[in-house]
Structures are given as structure tokens and as C-alpha cells.
């Protein structure tokens, strides 16, 4: 019976849309444009503990569509999930929160973003799959580089390195 309490546990408690905003600063004139828009996509991932063994993981996507120098639309969505994670070794917890949880959350966010764009009157934008493992590794490398650039080892409140 005691062994059951030590078994690794990864369980989805809830997946929810935390934030969704849409801006169309140049409508209705932008609907008369014949050019295809250029699409830019930005991604961010976050996680925070809520209670012992309970974590919130988030994926944020910002999609900006421009025609020439005019913004056709800007959509930002943040999908979140609450996960129960217990008896996972510390060295596996961060990758689980940075890779595993976003893989669960992202399909919901992708559908919500696509729905918001089409409901705004624009052709659908199909967001591609994201390899969160590569994304996680890139974030680790950027953090390591930032720490290497920080000669004093002191980081100021704004995230910049302290200067002597």
C-alpha cells in the first residue's frame, strides 16, 4: 500500500483558456486589401506551483498579420492547464513542465486562436505543430548564455546583469 503512494503521478486536472484578445486596428478598410498578409507567430511557455504537487502550466501565442505596413489583426491567447505531478525526480520536473504540459495544452490553444481569427472575418490561420523539446532546449541555452554574460553573478530586478 505504501508503494502506491510513491508511484510517479502525472494527471491533468483542468485545461482552460486563461486569456484571449483580438485587435483589428485597421478594420473595416483592411478587408478591402487584396494582398495576402504576412503572419508572425510568437510563443512563450510558463509554469508555476499552485500547491504541493499541483502546477499551472501556460502556453501563450501571439499571431500578428500585416498587409504592407498595416496590422490586419493581432491575436494573443494564453491556454493554461492545472496538473497534479507527484513523485517525479527533481531533474525531470522542469522538462515535464516545459515540454510535457505544453504538449497537452497547445492543441486547445491552437483551436481557440484559429476560431478567434475566423470569427473576426479573416481566412483561417493554421498554426503548425511546435516541438516543445527544441523550444525548451533553446530556452536553456539562452539562459546559460545570459548567465555566462553576467560577469558579477548578480542579476538586477529588471533581469539585467549588475555592472562594476
UniProtKB/Swiss-Prot annotation:
One of its GO terms (cellular component) is cytoplasm. InterPro entries: SecB, SecB-like_sf. The keyword Acetylation does not apply. GO terms for biological process: protein folding; protein tetramerization; protein transport. It is found in: Cytoplasm. It comes from the Bacteria. Disulfide bonds: none annotated. Keywords: Chaperone, Cytoplasm, Protein transport, Translocation, Transport. One of the proteins required for the normal export of preproteins out of the cell cytoplasm. It is a molecular chaperone that binds to a subset of precursor proteins, maintaining them in a translocation-competent state. It also specifically binds to its receptor SecA. Belongs to the SecB family. This is Protein-export protein SecB. It comes from Janthinobacterium sp. (strain Marseille) (Minibacterium massiliensis). The gene is secB.
Amino acid at each position: 500500500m505504501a508503494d502506491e503512494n510513491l508511484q510517479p503521478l502525472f494527471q491533468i486536472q483542468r485545461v482552460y483558456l486563461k486569456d484571449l484578445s483580438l485587435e483589428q486596428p485597421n478594420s473595416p478598410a483592411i478587408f478591402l486589401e487584396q494582398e495576402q498578409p504576412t503572419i508572425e507567430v510568437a510563443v512563450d511557455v510558463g509554469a508555476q506551483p499552485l500547491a504541493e504537487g499541483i502546477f499551472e502550466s501556460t502556453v501563450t501565442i501571439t499571431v500578428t498579420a500585416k498587409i504592407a505596413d498595416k496590422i490586419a489583426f493581432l491575436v494573443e491567447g494564453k491556454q493554461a492547464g492545472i496538473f497534479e505531478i507527484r513523485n517525479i525526480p527533481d531533474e525531470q520536473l522542469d522538462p515535464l513542465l516545459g515540454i510535457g504540459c505544453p504538449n497537452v495544452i497547445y492543441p486547445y490553444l491552437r483551436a481557440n486562436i484559429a476560431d478567434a481569427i475566423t470569427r473576426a472575418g479573416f481566412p483561417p490561420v493554421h498554426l503548425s505543430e511546435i516541438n516543445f523539446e527544441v523550444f525548451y532546449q533553446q530556452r536553456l541555452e539562452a539562459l546559460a548564455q545570459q548567465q555566462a554574460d553576467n560577469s558579477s553573478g548578480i542579476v538586477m530586478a529588471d533581469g539585467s546583469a549588475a555592472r562594476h
